[in-house]
Every structure is written in structure tokens, then in C-alpha cells.
């Protein structure tokens, strides 16, 4: 390792800048993750609602079909 690189690792300003940058990046990533998590949860809720509606429609169609009496031919 060169002397200049070793010197930078002991430089408080350099360390502080790296720490600040790292903290900022972690905050950004955390914010992005929270946004994605919220969007994902909203999409799951929407899908769940749509599936519930589909199940209800199918249930109604099955009940309607079973309540219709069969037509008998008189010929």
C-alpha cells in the first residue's frame, strides 16, 4: 500500500467524508426500499381484492346456474 493511501485512511476529513457518503447512500437505499415495500403491499392488496371479486362472481354464477331448472323437451 502506498504512503499516500495509508495517509488518507488516517485523515479524519477523508474518513468523515466517506462516512457521510456511506450514511447518505444507506438512507437513500432505505428510502427506496420502503417505497418499493409500500408499492408491493399495495399491489398485493389490489390483487387480493380482485381475486375476492372474481371468487364472488364465480360463486354467484354457480348459484345462478344451479338454481335454473333444466328445460324438458315436450316433443
From Swiss-Prot:
One GO cellular component, as annotated: cytosol
Pfam family, one: HSBP1
InterPro entries hit by this protein: HS1-bd
GO molecular function annotation: transcription corepressor activity
Superkingdom to which the source organism belongs: Eukaryota
UniProt cross-references to Gene3D superfamilies, sorted A to Z: 1.20.5.430
GO biological process: cellular heat acclimation
Family note: Belongs to the HSBP1 family.
Protein name (Swiss-Prot/TrEMBL): Uncharacterized protein C16E9.15
Amino acid at each position: 500500500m502506498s504512503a499516500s493511501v495509508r495517509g488518507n485512511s488516517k485523515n479524519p476529513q477523508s474518513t468523515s467524508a466517506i462516512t457521510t457518503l456511506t450514511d447518505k447512500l444507506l438512507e437513500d437505499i432505505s428510502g427506496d426500499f420502503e417505497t418499493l415495500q409500500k408499492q408491493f403491499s399495495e399491489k398485493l392488496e389490489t390483487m387480493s381484492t380482485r381475486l375476492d371479486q372474481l371468487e364472488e362472481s364465480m360463486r354467484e354464477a354457480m348459484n345462478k346456474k344451479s338454481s335454473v331448472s333444466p328445460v324438458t323437451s315436450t316433443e
